[in-house]
C-alpha cells in the first residue's frame, strides 16, 4: 500500500528543490521531518509540508500505520518557466527565468 502527495507549480527552481529532496529519500517519516525542520534552504518548508500532507493521506485515506511509514520515492521535476524582462544599460533588456517545480512524494509501509 502506498500514499502519495504532489505539489505543483511551486515557485522554486527544480535544481534547488532537488538538493533538499535528496536529503530525505529513503528515510523514515519522523526522521525526514526532523531533517527538514533544521535544513536552512528555501525548499525545506515546502517539502516538509508535502511530507506531512502525504502522512495525513496515508492515515486518513488508506488507514496506514504512521510509525511504519518511510519515503520510498520523492522527486522534484521541472514545471513551467515564467519569463520576465529586466531592463539593462543603453535600452537593452535581459530575460529572467523564474523557474517552477512539481514535487511528488510516495510513502510506503515497512
Curated annotation (Swiss-Prot):
Gene3D superfamilies: Ribosomal protein L22/L17 (3.90.470.10). PROSITE patterns: RIBOSOMAL_L22. One of its GO terms (molecular function) is rRNA binding. It comes from the Bacteria. InterPro entries: Ribosomal_uL22, Ribosomal_uL22_bac/chlpt-type, Ribosomal_uL22_bac/org-type, Ribosomal_uL22_CS, Ribosomal_uL22_sf. The keyword RNA-binding applies. It holds the Pfam family Ribosomal_L22. HAMAP family: Ribosomal_uL22_B. Belongs to the universal ribosomal protein uL22 family. This protein binds specifically to 23S rRNA; its binding is stimulated by other ribosomal proteins, e.g. L4, L17, and L20. It is important during the early stages of 50S assembly. It makes multiple contacts with different domains of the 23S rRNA in the assembled 50S subunit and ribosome. This is Large ribosomal subunit protein uL22. It comes from Alkaliphilus oremlandii (strain OhILAs). The gene is rplV.
Amino acid at each position: 500500500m502506498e500514499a502519495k502527495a504532489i505539489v505543483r507549480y511551486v515557485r522554486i527552481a527544480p535544481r534547488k528543490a532537488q538538493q533538499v529532496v535528496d536529503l530525505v529519500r529513503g528515510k523514515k517519516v519522523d526522521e525526514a521531518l526532523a531533517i527538514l525542520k533544521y535544513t536552512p534552504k528555501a525548499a525545506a518548508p515546502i517539502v516538509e509540508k508535502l511530507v506531512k500532507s502525504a502522512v495525513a493521506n496515508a492515515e486518513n485515506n488508506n488507514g496506514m500505520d504512521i510509525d511504519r511509514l518511510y519515503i520510498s520515492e520523492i522527486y522534484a521535476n521541472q514545471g513551467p518557466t515564467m519569463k520576465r524582462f529586466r531592463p539593462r544599460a543603453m535600452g537593452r533588456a535581459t530575460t529572467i527565468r523564474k523557474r517552477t517545480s512539481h514535487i511528488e512524494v510516495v510513502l510506503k509501509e515497512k
